[in-house]
From Swiss-Prot:
Pfam families: GHMP_kinases_C (PF08544), GHMP_kinases_N (PF00288). The gene is thrB. HAMAP family: Homoser_kinase. Pathway: Amino-acid biosynthesis; L-threonine biosynthesis; L-threonine from L-aspartate: step 4/5. GO terms for molecular function: ATP binding; homoserine kinase activity. Its EC number is 2.7.1.39. GO terms for cellular component: cytoplasm. One of its GO terms (biological process) is threonine biosynthetic process. The lineage of its organism: Bacteria, Bacillati, Actinomycetota, Actinomycetes, Mycobacteriales. This is Homoserine kinase.
């Protein structure tokens, strides 16, 4: 029989955003970034109260359809606990549908909050597994859970049972910084995936495998390899037609020597480097309505009793 969480129990979660793919590492590499959502969850007598401020305010549902709420419910069920009612407050800074892991952060915050309310009965692997079921891949989720960079993978059993999601952290060189150029437009991951071909030439697959290896060395040991390590032939060339502004800025930045790439499904463009991007370039981006954020590599999700 499930244990009931006492009314009045409250936890606060701080979850970082993330970038996925990082150029060649399609659906496998992720990086936590210092832009955060804050979620407070309190057990109340009955019902559900949802409040959202910041990013997504006035746009996301304030009922059981809210992703954080769905993730909380999944976490409580997995932990075998129940709550009479929930009050959920979300203060969001991660831009939504921009390729910075907002949906993964929501799923992670909900599962982590539920686990904290239950007394921390779920281990890290279970949290990644549970949160990744909302995404269908673990790259952003694992980055938000573990912090730093991650290598992630999915195993799909031949017997048709549910996929299992896995990740391992990668320590990032301390000199690496991130600059995000965030266009004022949304990108649906599903829509942007539709332009990808079902098959790619063996030569291009080999190219991406080698560059993924180079990128891991660049991230952990030798940042001078970041430009070479962020080259890609698997997904970004095909997404250029539906993300023309992003493609323009990726090409402009790379042509000037900056390791730029599409963050996740876009439209955000991310630069990873040890030196700042030239201010004149960033100002031009701002003048064209593109938001610029100077970020650092973030640590893992954190939680505390409120």
């Amino acid at each position: 029989m499930a244990t009931e969480i006492p009314v009045g129990r409250k936890v606060r979660v701080k979850v970082p955003g993330s970038s996925a793919n990082l150029g060649p590492g399609f659906d496998s590499l992720g990086l936590a970034l210092s832009i955060y959502d804050h979620v407070e969850v309190e057990v109340i007598d009955s019902g559900l109260e949802v409040e959202v401020t910041g990013e997504g305010q006035g746009e996301v549902p304030l009922d059981e359809r809210h992703l954080v709420v769905r993730a909380i419910r999944a976490g409580l069920k997995k932990a075998d606990v129940i709550a009479r009612g929930l009050r959920v407050r979300c203060n969001n800074s991660i831009p939504q549908s921009r390729g910075l892991g907002s949906s993964a952060a929501a799923a992670v915050s909900g599962v982590v909050a539920a686990n904290a309310l239950a007394g921390d009965v779920l281990d890290t692997d279970t949290i990644i597994q549970l949160a990744s079921t909302f995404e269908g891949h673990p790259d952003n989720v694992a980055a938000s859970v573990l912090g730093s960079a991650v290598v992630s993978w999915t195993n799909i059993p031949v017997d048709g049972t549910e996929p299992t999601y896995h990740a391992s952290p990668v320590t990032v060189h301390p000199d690496i910084r991130a600059t995000a150029l965030i266009p004022n437009s949304h990108a649906s991951t599903e829509a942007v995936r539709r332009v990808l071909p079902s098959d790619i030439p063996h030569l291009d697959a080999r190219f991406n495998v080698s560059r993924t290896g180079v990128l891991l060395v660049a991230l952990s040991k030798d940042p001078s390899l970041l430009w070479e390590g962020t080259r890609d032939r698997m997904h970004q060339p095909f997404r250029a037609e539906v993300l023309p502004i992003s493609s323009e800025w990726v090409n402009r930045l790379r042509n000037q020597g900056y390791p730029a790439f599409l963050s996740g499904a876009g439209p955000t463009v991310l630069v990873l480097s040890t030196e700042p991007v030239e201010e004149a370039l960033l100002q031009e981006a701002r003048d064209r309505g593109i938001r610029v954020e100077e970020l650092t590599v973030a640590g893992p999700v954190t939680v505390e009793d409120a």
